[in-house]
Amino acid sequence: MNKHTLTRISEEAFNELTRIKQTTNLPHQTVMQLAIAKEVTESDLLKYPVSKGRKHIRITQDALDTLKALNGFKIDIARLLSLKIHKLSLEV
């Protein structure tokens, strides 16, 4: 299944995602896979605030299902994905 759907992320994460794609010249789907693979810890939840403003982004249904399965903290998917994108942006 390679269908795309939309999900939400914070405005900051959206800007970080754009910067990562421009800096690395990697396609959107690759950057999303890298972000989803990032581990989010309890300290990340406390250390990195996520704004309430949201933007929609494209994601494959498989990637969204993976993200939901990795949501051990049972937090909002938008917050979880925003944290993962932020952690990836710290490495770029």
Task: Describe the residue ranges of each PLM region.
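Short Lys/Arg-rich basic patches
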Residues: 1-15, 21, 41-65, 71, ...
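Short, basic amphipathic alpha-helical segments that act as recognition/interaction helices
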Residues: 20-49, 73-92
